């Protein structure tokens, strides 16, 4: 009798493991992967062994501002941006919690654009971008409960989001090859741009007045500080440079006061245009984001601050950090492709090749009017 019970128990456990394995693989395939930028939850969870030393969370200002190619090639800093477009501070709080649940980085950087906005009014896209890619855990449950309360949703909606029903319900109809095979496993989260849009310097640059932050946002900032401190992980706040309003600058000034009171470094690059060397004629892609040129300047300042403050290790050449090498190569190749693309004619294109690929063999595949090269 006992032997039969033992066999049945083993069968039940094997069945549960089988269902869990199949379910996990299906969720990996059907998972909602579009976070509006950054490296993505699925790449974050796949990190094994050698994790990033620096994690960056926040909105598009996070993944459009800190260039992981520069961080790695020039400083050897292994970073990863876990962000989502238009991310609010409540999402940033739970992102920080998830990082601390699974990793122990040297430092976590939080981009605080949402502190300059109004309240924490979440929309459907916030739910999809931020929560559906997260693994089941107590942290996800708390986040979904918070979203349900924030958006005045009932328990059916809450349970459906936690069970990832939005994934299973409709994703089958929009699957692509990317859902079965990650074509960019090396992506560390930087989403740059070569576009250039010219602006005047914002008048708010020198505004030092502070405007009170929304209480909900103070609560989220406090939560991040407490969580990181409990795990012994340093926290850094930063505001990316953009053409901001007087009110937004005043709220960043309030974040600076909060950070000072809580012994958290805060880099507001909207007070540091000259210090960083930002040029509003060439360093911005649009009114809200820097381009590759501007990102490089901000990243170098950030990297030097991190090295001086936290003594981060140089991981270049270390076994287990090959993805950072590949990501840097990917970003470098994008620069080369762009430089070739903006050539005025084929002669300029050909002149650039030996400069860009010195010591390399270049194969040209020609179609059309071959006589143009004569």
Regions found by a protein language model. Give the residues of each.
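Membrane-embedded segments
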Residues: 57, 61-146
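Short acidic-hydrophobic catalytic motif
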Residues: 336-374
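C-terminal regions of proteins
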Residues: 249-324
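Active-site-proximal beta-strand/loop segments in catalytic clefts of secreted hydrolases
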Residues: 57-60, 82-85, 111-113, 238-242, ...
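Hydrophobic membrane-insertion alpha-helices, especially the h-region
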Residues: 7-28
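Secreted/periplasmic serine-hydrolase-like ester/acetyl group-modifying domain
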Residues: 125-233, 315-337
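Acidic-and-aromatic substrate-binding clefts and catalytic sites of carbohydrate-active enzymes
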Residues: 86-90, 213-217, 243-250
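Alpha-helical transmembrane signal-anchor/signal-peptide segments
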Residues: 29-50
């Amino acid at each position: 009798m006992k032997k039969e019970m033992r066999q049945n128990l083993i069968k039940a456990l094997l069945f549960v493991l089988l269902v869990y394995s199949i379910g996990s693989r299906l969720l990996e395939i059907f998972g909602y992967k579009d976070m509006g930028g950054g490296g993505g939850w699925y790449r974050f969870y796949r990190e094994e062994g050698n994790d990033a030393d620096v994690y960056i969370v926040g909105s598009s200002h996070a993944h459009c501002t800190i260039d992981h190619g520069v961080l790695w090639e020039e400083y050897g800093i292994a970073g990863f941006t876990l962000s989502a477009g238009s991310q609010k501070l409540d999402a940033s709080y739970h992102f920080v919690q998830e990082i601390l649940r699974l990793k122990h980085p040297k430092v976590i950087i939080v981009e605080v654009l949402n502190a300059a906005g109004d309240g924490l009014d979440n929309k459907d896209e916030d739910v999809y971008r931020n929560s559906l890619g997260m693994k089941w855990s107590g942290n996800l449950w708390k986040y979904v409960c918070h979203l349900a309360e924030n958006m005045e949703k009932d328990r059916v909606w809450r349970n459906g989001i936690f069970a990832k029903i939005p994934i299973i319900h409709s994703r089958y109809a929009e699957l692509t090859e990317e859902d079965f095979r990650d074509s960019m496993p090396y992506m560390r989260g930087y989403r740059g741009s070569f576009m250039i849009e010219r602006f005047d310097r914002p008048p708010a640059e020198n505004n030092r007045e502070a405007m009170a932050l929304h209480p909900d946002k103070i609560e989220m900032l406090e939560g991040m500080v407490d969580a990181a401190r409990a795990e012994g992980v340093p926290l850094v706040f930063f505001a990316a440079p953009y053409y901001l309003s007087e009110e937004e600058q005043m709220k960043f000034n309030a974040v600076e006061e909060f950070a000072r009171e809580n012994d958290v470094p805060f880099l507001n690059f909207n007070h540091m245009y000259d210090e960083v060397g930002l040029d509003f004629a060439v360093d911005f892609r649009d009114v809200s984001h820097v381009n590759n040129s501007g990102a490089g300047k901000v990243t170098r300042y950030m990297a030097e601050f991190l090295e001086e403050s936290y003594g981060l290790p140089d991981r270049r050449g270390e076994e287990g950090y090959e993805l950072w090498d590949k990501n840097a190569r990917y970003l470098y190749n994008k620069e080369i492709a762009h430089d070739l693309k903006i050539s005025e004619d084929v002669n300029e294109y050909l002149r650039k090749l030996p400069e860009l690929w010195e010591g390399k063999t270049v194969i040209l595949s020609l179609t059309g009017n071959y006589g143009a090269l004569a």
